Amino acid sequence: EMLRSLVGSEMCIRDSYDGVVPVLRKLKEKGYALAIVSNKIDFAVKELNEIYFEGIVQAAIGEREGVARKPAPDMVHTALAELGKPADTAVYIGDSDVDVMTAKNSGLPCISVLWGFRDKEFLIEHGATNFAEKPEDIVKFLEQ
């Protein structure tokens, strides 16, 4: 039974972190559908997705009219619709308290990455329970 992954992190906005692209490639090769949801402006999210993750991430959703920003679930629902995937097959991966809240509001399990915007203690204070210390940990978590 394959669990589909929804990548909600903004890890691509500034640049991709070491090890992220190979992990995303591996997940795609394993059949996972991948998306980015970001509160950054939509055209920039799409452009950065093409620059850093072309051919890997199938949907990139940014701030746009008619779609509420995170932590509302709207962007996640839009991404899932674009991917053609139901929420019960998705996991939200992010690096902030907003991502933890977005996952909760979307009814998705969340993996909080520790190489991004916030540290582990802060994320725990905001409800995070699953952590990836390095990108490879995401694959291990999904294969449990």
Roles of regions detected by a PLM:
Residues K28, Y32, I41-Q144:
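Asp-based, Mg2+/Mn2+-dependent phosphohydrolase catalytic module
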Residues S9, D18-K30:
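A metal-dependent, Asp-based hydrolase signature
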Residues S16-Y17, R69:
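A conditional alpha-helix N-cap/helix-loop micro-motif detector
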Residues E1-G8, C12-I13:
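Single conserved hydrophobic/aromatic residue that forms the stacking wall/gate
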